[in-house]
Amino acid sequence: MTKNQNQYQQPNPDDRSDNVEKLQDMVQNTIENIEEAEASMEFASGEDKQRIKEKNARREQSIEAFRNEIQDESAARQNGYRS
């Protein structure tokens, strides 16, 4: 293996330092998506309204999972990312 090929074999180090912030951004973006979807329901057909409601329910579940992950990552950060 040449030197160039070998440099591509090495994995990137695990950098969790900004995970909380990324997850918070994901929560905010998902909330905005819910709000935009709800606004679009005014112009949607009955079938589309049902799809939007179902998708927003899944988005709410995602937000809950993101918030749980934020708590986990925040605790890990406070513990210096030790197991």
Swiss-Prot record:
Alphabetical list of InterPro entries matching this protein: SASP_thioredoxin-like
Stretches that traverse the bilayer: none
Ranges where the record places region Disordered: 37-60
A Gene Ontology BP annotation from the UniProt entry: asexual sporulation
Conditions for induction: Expressed only in the forespore compartment of sporulating cells. Disappears after 45 minutes of spore germination. Expression is sigma F and sigma G-dependent.
Statement: the UniProt record of this protein carries the keyword Cell membrane: no
Keywords linked to the UniProt accession: Sporulation
Compositional bias annotation for Basic and acidic residues: 46-60
Intrachain disulfide bonds: none
Domain of life: Bacteria
Pfam families: Tlp (PF19824)
Subcellular location: Spore core
Family: Belongs to the Tlp family.
Protein name according to UniProt: Small, acid-soluble spore protein Tlp
